[in-house]
Amino acid sequence: MAGFEIIEIPSLEDGRIDIEALKAVVDDTVALMMVTNPNTLGLFENDISDASDIIHSVGGQMYYDGANFNAILGRTSPGLMGFDAVHFNLHKTFSQPHGGGGPGSGPIGVKGHLAEFLPGPIVKKRPIVGDEAKFAVDEMWYGWYQPANSIGKVQQWHGNSGAVIRCWAYYRRYGYGLKDMSEHAVLNANYLRHALHREAKNAGVEDMFVDGANTHVAKHEFTLSLQPAKEKYGISAMDVAKGLLDQGYMAPTVYFPLVVPECMMFEPTETESRDTLDQFAKDFIKVLQQDAETLHEAPITTPVRRVDEVYAARNLCLRHPFDDE
């Protein structure tokens, strides 16, 4: 994009940014660095301030992917970590539904030095003019504002306005309680992680998976590698995910992040009860105890059986065909 090259910064053994590797590639041609914190392994980037200082030292900007903001809400902020711009995933932190491709919404926020570069027009407060005083609830009114260095409108320039309003209502309703929600999301993830290991040990199947990251405490999500199960029993992460559908669960994300072989990613969120987490852990182990041939056929009880996902991805059918086509 715009003639820039994307450079991937490797991780250390603990799953976090390799600061020395970052230093080795940074020069005055760097435009920005994009980071998710906590990262997709569920680990907080402890050296994020150092990374920000390195990028800023050459005039670059820091961009925050808000995908995992639910883990730190009320505890810290992208600004404190040194980020200059951020997009918030409203479907992951602020109550928006996210199924079937939408309605996703990712509002972008920037620090003051970038405000005049935002796409426009944007809504901004301005003094009241004329009869507007009859409708105003304070001494200001809202109007359109075109930032001085804006490129103007871009596609979907105001995004999904309904999602934004719902987010605002959610934020206003819970206020400081959002911090508690974040803490419960982290607590639930760590509780489930340890519950899975406990149930696996009790059932004698602890040799079927390992942690995706070497850490004592994760944030709002964690990963497991089913590589041992695949090597010993021919059971893949996809098989286990399909088996969980038969148990009545929405399956965890599989094969992401890519750095974890046969990866399953668990993000229980703050809304699940302890009883639900305990039952899920038991049912997960129940799936692991099934024979490989049974799991290869899963799901069995759902209205739609296992689909050929590779074929579906390569042969898109975006609408139902009419009879005369």
What are these regions (language model features)?
Residues R198, G248-A251:
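Hard-cation-handling environments
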Residues E206-Q247, L258, E262-Q279:
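Conserved PLP-binding catalytic core of the aspartate aminotransferase-like
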Residues M1-E13, A21, T29, I235-L244, ...:
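Non-catalytic terminal/interface segments that mediate subunit docking, oligomerization
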Residues E13, N39, R173-G177, P228-K230, ...:
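A generic structural motif
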Residues G79, A85-Q227:
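Active-site C-terminal subdomain of aminotransferase-like
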Residues A24, N46-S57, L187, Y191, ...:
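Alpha-helical scaffolding segments of alpha/beta enzyme cores, especially the outer helices
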Residues L258-E325:
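PLP-dependent enzyme catalytic core of the Aspartate aminotransferase-like
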Residues M1-W141, N149, I235, P261-E262:
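Conserved PLP-enzyme active-site core in the AAT-like
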